[in-house]
Amino acid sequence: MNIINLPELNYEVFFVFIELGLIFGSLGVVFLTNIVYSAFLLGLVFVCISFLYLLLDADFVATAQILIYVGAVNILIVFAVMLINKPQSLQFLPSWTVGDTITLILCTSLFFLLISMILSISWSNIFSIAQSNKIGEQVLKSSVQGIGSSLLIDFLLPFELLSIVLLVALIGAITIARREKKVKLQKNRTLQVTKDSFIL
């Protein structure tokens, strides 16, 4: 599917929906205290980023974005959170700290810096993507073939090591969850013994 060939109005509407998904998803990841909801909203952000790659006619990068970040990293985060099973607070907005103030100042400064850079660029001098479609297709084909051969020939060992790293992270989450369950069981047994001795 070549989204770049859509009519201009549909293209702009699609872009607006993607940006809204990115903005609200990112705000939800930051402000929600429930980690499970934050993880799912992070997956929404990753999907919206892959749609941006589709708008740029980079199908392979969009597919890799979904497979790696949504299919691997985000699912791993969800499984780890579900296994750890931390008690979640019912408060929607967390308490404000000094670190939050510093982060807000830095993010606001970065936002206005990006806005000033965008406004200072002369966009009329940038060539349209449609004019360089043929060159882009040739580069995409060569880059996809190059990436595939590099992953399976030159970088096969690091590629396999990445999967081992994800597996180690999942095993670590399971181990932490089992330790917490053992500690809870020991505390419950201690409390039960104390109650029984008090009754006797």
UniProtKB/Swiss-Prot annotation:
It is an enzyme of class 7 (translocase). The keyword Iron-sulfur does not apply. Its EC number is 7.1.1.-. It comes from the Eukaryota. It is a multi-pass membrane protein. GO terms for molecular function: NADH dehydrogenase (ubiquinone) activity; quinone binding. It is found in: Plastid, Chloroplast thylakoid membrane. It catalyses: a plastoquinone + NADH + (n+1) H(+)(in) = a plastoquinol + NAD(+) + n H(+)(out); a plastoquinone + NADPH + (n+1) H(+)(in) = a plastoquinol + NADP(+) + n H(+)(out). Its main location: plastid. The keyword Transmembrane applies. Keywords: Chloroplast, Membrane, NAD, NADP, Plastid, Plastoquinone, Quinone, Thylakoid, Translocase, Transmembrane, Transmembrane helix, Transport. Gene3D superfamilies: NADH-ubiquinone/plastoquinone oxidoreductase chain 6, subunit NuoJ (1.20.120.1200). GO terms for cellular component: chloroplast thylakoid membrane. It holds the Pfam family Oxidored_q3. The chain crosses the membrane at residues 13-33, 35-55, 64-84, 101-121, 156-176. NDH is composed of at least 16 different subunits, 5 of which are encoded in the nucleus. PANTHER family: NAD(P)H-QUINONE OXIDOREDUCTASE SUBUNIT 6, CHLOROPLASTIC. Belongs to the complex I subunit 6 family. NDH shuttles electrons from NAD(P)H:plastoquinone, via FMN and iron-sulfur (Fe-S) centers, to quinones in the photosynthetic chain and possibly in a chloroplast respiratory chain. The immediate electron acceptor for the enzyme in this species is believed to be plastoquinone. Couples the redox reaction to proton translocation, and thus conserves the redox energy in a proton gradient. This is NAD(P)H-quinone oxidoreductase subunit 6, chloroplastic. It comes from Anthoceros angustus (Hornwort).
